[in-house]
Amino acid sequence: MAEDTQGTDTPSTAPINVPDKPALEGLEAALTRRWLAEGTYKFNPDTTREQVYSIDTPPPTASGSLHVGHMFSFTQTDVLARYQRMIGKNVFYPMGWDDNGLPTERRVQNYYGVRCDPATPYDAGYRAPAEPAKNQRDFDVVSRRNFIELCEELAVEDEKVFESLFQQLGLSVDWQLTYRTIDDASREVSQRAFLANLAAGDAYMAEAPTLWDITFRTAVAQAELEDREVAGAYYRYPFFTEDGEKIYVETTRPELLAACAALVANPDDERYQPLFGKKVTSPVFGVEVEVRAHALAKADKGSGIAMVCTFGDLTDVTWWRELQLPTRAIVGRDGRIIGETPDWITTDAGRTAYEAIAGKTVFSAKEAVVELLAAEDLIDGEPKKIMHPVNFYEKGDKPLEVVTSRQWYYRNGGRDEERRARLIARGHEIDFHPAFMRSRFENWISGLNGDWLVSRQRFFGVPIPVWYPLDADGNPQYGAPIVPLDEQLPVDPAADAAPGYDEAQRGVPGGFAGDADILDTWATSSLTPQIVGGWSRDEDLFAKVFPFDLRPQGHDIIRTWLFSSVVQADALQHAAPWKHAAISGWILDPDRKKMSKSKGNVVVPTDVLDEFGSDAVRYWATSAKLGADTAYEIAQMKIGRRLAIKLLNASKFVLNLGATENSVVSTDLSVLTNPLDRAVLAQLAEVVRQSTKAFENYDYARALQITESFFWQFTDDYVELIKDRAYGAAGDAEQASVLAALATSLDTLLRLFAPFLPFATEEVWGWWRNGSVHVAQWPLAVDVDGDTTLLATVGTALSGVRKAKSEAKVKQRTEVLSATITASESLTTQLKAGLGDLKAASNARELTLVAGEGELTVSDVVLAAPAEQPKA
């Protein structure tokens, strides 16, 4: 039912060599070594685009350890890769490591006990402490260059561990196609993309309110936000009109009272319409602000009128921008209230009050402002305690602030309807699996409220490749950035002089200053197709792999990785980056919560692989459909292990039948004479058709279910039914027929199972075939003149006889003197075709077939006296 890789009708056979005691133990290490040595999964660049199947593999974050979720999603990708390889595709299957950005930076800080200060001189002989300090205040202070060296050193060690684990899992990656998102090639591609976007007007710098993480001291993009429910309270206090009337506001952030730039109410709210355009005075600080109208104000929220502070949240930013309000920022980038009293606070009482909060964290400042309000008896009632969603950076542990800063942005449709529509159209060039995941992509685009902020105020990452000329006073001319020559890439403006300047001119009037920021890690990770495909470096390779055939990833990063990759490919290649997107679900713990390192509920992959074996873990992973959140189930892994062991043992039985020294097993179908043999192969042909269709639809779980269901029927029923004939009891012709059916079935089943159980199938393949099953051809459905339901019917009758023996508490080999099988006329006809095998398997002298109505039943079973009673 299959052809081998040489394209011949007869697979390449070898003398049978079956071990006495087949076992799964030790297969992973031995076969991995062989695959690596033989280049089993090596991509052949001497090919055409039509022959290639290219995969944009997700690079896992190199920040300590993998978890069971990686095994789950990467295995799902691997079975798709293995199927494509077996149908004749030249599979381009790389592996990357995402080792730039905050996760690596944070791990290095804690692992070595260091923190970076760009002002610290480089120490060429620096060695990190043997034992890191327990308190971060005692960490070694190192230069940016020293810090980056430590990041690279630790990332390389982590990646070795990751590679070893993925090989143990059986990923059919070409391990010569690896990259790191911080290596020279990745930095070159990332910087070249930035410069291309800059030249096209798709990258720009702006000074504007920015979401800011006070722990990491960096700007954060919309895609990196995470809403978390936190405890808070509404405080109600008044502003005062000119005639002393109290206008009450209700806010969860009284600490921003000194930053208030206006009060705002809905234009249709009759309570406040008389106040629009008039001034009111803030309590405690005594600052006049105007009452304004805006449609975003909600009449039914709180008192219906709100403070506009610069800036409490993104709604404040919208009001500030659209109402053209003054900027009155009081929160610094360190999350503390700015020390210098702002000039808009002019009264002595107000300036004294500000001194009471200056330098405090926002949390301490809140307490101080509440005390100041209470001291003047201005708090109306008790604070109303609530739980409410607050913006956090997804990797941070403190609420985000909004501060004004100068940042770089990529245009992503957040402010451009035409671009937004174009990006949605790009999404329709991609087949999403499952299809409903497309709506998450489109909903994200539709909900964007700004362009993509790509600059970060951190140390370890891809430097933004620009410098700025300094005027006569030493001020940077941000509007006239200096860009590197193409052949200079990659560059580090903090270490490399700008073109046309020398290092002595750095930081002096009339000289230059390098941009100190790095690119957001997603700005580089979004370019994985371009990085691994050789864009701008190997155009021949790029033409063969781009657009990639497959992007596999989790559904939680559709808004980040998938979307940003579409943005980059649209801008750079004017195309979608892939043809298909396979979206994995989450792994859930026993409480049905997502497993994640941050939650502390992850399972260590090595423990699971060592206990159950890789094939068992792969079985669990591929039993789940794409997009489905799946429970971590030990029971499912046990089933997978049982399946792999059964495959070894059943294969041993088949191959040992009639085997002699140096013999080979024949799959010559011309010798088929028995109806049951033809039936099992006809049924198997249908399994091949259905499994192939499922794989073509990216439904590997369906392919596994179909194959596994047939396999158990094959081993439990067919193998039991034909044993007598297989041993020659019915003559040479019948034996030849059954041996050909067995060998053909085994050959086909090994190929069908190969993507799922790569170790067990490869082990068995080596017992009687040359080469690797993983580069053998996917089985072809060969039409055999047989009844596809015959095996099920005869198997049901056999089960009925077995049940009677079990109920009589005798061994299954006990002779049946007589029994009656009642079935419909059509089933009776089928039973006649398999009656010889049924009698032999049942050890029955006489089986009487009776045509009747209803389901098949076995009755009137008369058993011979057992030679030996079964043990209790």
Regions found by a protein language model. Name each.
Residues 113-146, 345-357, 481-506:
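Charged, glycine/proline-rich intrinsically disordered loops and linkers
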Residues 216, 285, 396-397, 470-472, ...:
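Short Cys/His-rich metal-coordination motifs, predominantly Zn2+-binding knuckles/fingers
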Residues 2-268, 309-344, 373-420, 446-449, ...:
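N-terminal, positively charged nucleic-acid-binding surface of large information/translation enzymes
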Residues 3, 7-9, 236, 448-523, ...:
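Feature 926 captures the class I aminoacyl-tRNA synthetase adenylation module centered on the KMSKS loop
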Residues 208-209, 260-262, 403-405, 462, ...:
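Short hydrophobic alpha-helical segments that form membrane-spanning helices or hydrophobic packing faces
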Residues 73, 106-114, 220-222, 266-267, ...:
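Short secondary-structure boundary/capping segments
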Residues 69-81, 89, 97-98, 186-189, ...:
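Structured ligand/cofactor/substrate-binding pocket environments in proteins
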Residues 49-57, 79, 130-138, 163-170, ...:
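Active-site-adjacent bridging/hinge elements
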